[in-house]
């Protein structure tokens, strides 16, 4: 019916402007590390496991691209209470955890409550 169901922006960290600090911290492996910098689902698709399905599909795609890892920078669900639906664009932690991503550290832009973290999946 032409409805947009999801949108994901993913690619090598070195191809994106805003994670330059993260790419610098990773050094040479940043070239083979992909970052999911945006991830959103249409309201009609939320709560149905779609985030996990998309993340699972990114794994073989990432291997085909030669990536060695995929990182994401989602918000903790507690951020929804504070910021309402304006924080959904990078995704929520539950979908990444369900897809096997592991929290590595607090996000460099996050506040002290760490409502946003870095999650990583090694390919």
Residue ranges and their predicted role:
Residues 3-38, 83-89:
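Conserved acyl-donor/pantetheine-binding loop and adjacent beta-alpha core of acyl/acetyltransferases
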Residues 13-15, 44, 77:
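Short coil/turn motifs at secondary-structure junctions
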Residues 17, 79-80, 113:
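Generic structural signal for helix capping and beta-alpha/helix-loop junctions
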Residues 62-87:
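Conserved GNAT acetyl-CoA-binding A-motif
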Residues 2, 76-77, 110:
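Conserved beta-strand edge residues that scaffold enzyme active sites
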Residues 38-41, 47-63:
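Conserved acetyl-CoA-binding loop-helix of GNAT-fold acetyltransferases
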Residues 88-99, 105-123:
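C-terminal "cap" of GNAT-fold acetyltransferases
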């Amino acid at each position: 019916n032409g409805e947009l169901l999801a949108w994901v922006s993913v690619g090598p960290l070195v191809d994106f402007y805003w994670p330059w600090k993260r790419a610098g911290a990773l050094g040479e492996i940043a070239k083979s590390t992909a970052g999911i910098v945006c991830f959103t689902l249409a309201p009609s698709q939320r709560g149905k496991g779609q985030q996990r399905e998309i993340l699972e599909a990114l794994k073989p795609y990432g291997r085909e691209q030669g990536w060695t890892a995929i990182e994401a920078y989602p918000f903790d669900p507690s951020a929804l209470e504070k910021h309402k639906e304006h924080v959904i664009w990078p995704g929520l932690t539950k979908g990444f955890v369900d897809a096997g991503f592991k929290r590595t550290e607090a996000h460099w832009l996050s506040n002290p409550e760490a409502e946003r973290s870095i999650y990583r999946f090694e390919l």
